[in-house]
Amino acid sequence: MSESYNHIFVSLRPMTAEMYHAYYKEYQNDPDLYIDKSKYTPFVYSPEWVNNYIQRQISRNRKCFAIMLRDEMAGEIIIKNIVPGKSAALGICMKNAHYKDRGIGTQAERLAINYVFNELDIPLLYADSILTNTRSQHVLEKVGFRLLREEGDFKYYSIERSP
């Protein structure tokens, strides 16, 4: 799965254990995304943490993809809560600030939506965003998600496949 727009070439590749370790060695969590800033602590790479994370993804029957900017891993997209033929949910995380505000996440979300609708044959996709993540909310709305509701610290979205 790939897409090129404004000379930015983005593709999605299934995540491998090696890719996860490479990703998290360079990962930086964003303090601006914490509602309670006192709970923020910088991410510190740990091989054990990454191995446990991989096992959680496998045990939850998720489809995990690396967001590739040419040959660089820019982030991760996860298709989760999969109910075959009915619905799934989308999650996205960029590796660090270098990959934000460049259209990479937008292209990756478009590719993921296409994959869910056409490859998995799932007609309904959900996503959510914490209230403070206005960047994510903008991208979700830009690619066609519609706001369902605001509840607690989150906004909930959905997009349906066209008939």
Regions of interest found by a model, annotated:
Residues 32-53:
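Conserved GNAT-fold acetyl-CoA-binding loop/helix
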Residues 31, 41-42, 58, 148:
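Residue-level detector of secondary-structure transition/capping positions
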